């Protein structure tokens, strides 16, 4: 007595193997294609969060770029209560959301603080001269000086005895 295993058809998988999905039927010409149903994870499995986007995933970045600029997810917008759309300005919209990878800097140029250190040690330049110069008028030219005693001499056409025409 020999026991024979029943032959499995080519369509049935081995025990323990997942069942193969049937081939989608081709729609008739002129009919829209049906979208495949998204595969949902099994109820027991938690959904894995996607890794946060990095600027380096989309752009070539400088080697000297600080880490915070490669991770825009670290920044948060300054969200506030929604303003009435009639009164909303573009400035309010700009600061209310976190930046995307496309808005982050790709290159970083650090600046020296040599200027600030020098002024912290010695202070700003101060002129101790006495202010005795006369003001030169841009209206009358460099030859005419406006002084404290001749304030009405600001333009050659200002003369009550003659018409107001420049000589």
From Swiss-Prot:
Keywords: Cell projection, Cilium, Cytoplasm, Cytoskeleton, Flagellum. InterPro entries: PIRC1/2. GO terms for biological process: axoneme assembly; cellular response to UV-C; cilium movement; determination of left/right symmetry; DNA damage response; establishment of left/right asymmetry; flagellated sperm motility; regulation of gene expression. Disruption phenotype: Mutant mice exhibit severe laterality defects, including situs inversus totalis and heterotaxy with randomized situs and left and right isomerisms. They show partial embryonic lethality associated with heterotaxia. The motility of tracheal cilia in adult mice is also affected. At 8 dpc, they have a reduced beat frequency of nodal cilia. 50% of tracheal cilia axonemes have missing dynein arms. Double PIERCE1 and PIERCE2 mutants show high levels of embryonic and pre-weaning lethality. The few mice that survive birth display hydrocephalus and laterality abnormalities, dying by 20 days of age. Residues 16-54 have a biased composition (Basic and acidic residues). It is found in: Cytoplasm, Cytoskeleton, Cilium axoneme; Cytoplasm, Cytoskeleton, Flagellum axoneme. Expressed in brain, lung, kidney and testis. Induction: By p53/TP53. Protein levels are stabilized following gamma-irradiation. The keyword Transmembrane does not apply. Its main location: cytoplasm. Residues 1-54 are annotated as: Disordered. GO terms for cellular component: axonemal A tubule inner sheath; axonemal microtubule; cytoplasm; nucleus; sperm flagellum. Signal peptide: none annotated. Belongs to the PIERCE1 family. Microtubule inner protein component of sperm flagellar doublet microtubules. Interacts with CFAP53, ODAD1 and ODAD3; the interactions link the outer dynein arms docking complex (ODA-DC) to the internal microtubule inner proteins (MIP) in cilium axoneme. Microtubule inner protein involved in the attachment of outer dynein arms (ODAs) to dynein-decorated doublet microtubules (DMTs) in cilia axoneme. Functions at the initial step of left-right asymmetry specification of the visceral organs. This is Piercer of microtubule wall 1 protein. The gene is Pierce1.
């Amino acid at each position: 007595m020999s026991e024979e295993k029943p032959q499995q058809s080519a369509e049935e998988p081995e025990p323990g193997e997942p069942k193969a999905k049937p081939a989608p039927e081709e729609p008739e010409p002129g009919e829209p294609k049906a979208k495949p149903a998204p595969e949902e994870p099994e109820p027991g499995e938690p959904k894995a969060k996607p890794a946060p986007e990095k600027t380096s995933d989309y752009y070539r970045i400088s080697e000297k770029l600080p880490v915070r600029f490669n991770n825009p997810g670290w920044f948060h917008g300054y969200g506030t209560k929604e303003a009435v759309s009639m009164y909303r300005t573009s400035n309010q919209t700009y600061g209310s959301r976190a930046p995307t990878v496309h808005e982050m800097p790709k290159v970083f140029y650090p600046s020296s603080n040599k200027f600030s250190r020098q002024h912290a040690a010695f202070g700003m330049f101060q002129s101790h001269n006495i202010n005795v110069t006369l003001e030169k008028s841009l209206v009358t030219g460099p030859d005419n000086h406006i002084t404290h005693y001749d304030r009405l001499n600001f333009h050659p056409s200002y003369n009550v005895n003659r018409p107001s025409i420049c000589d």
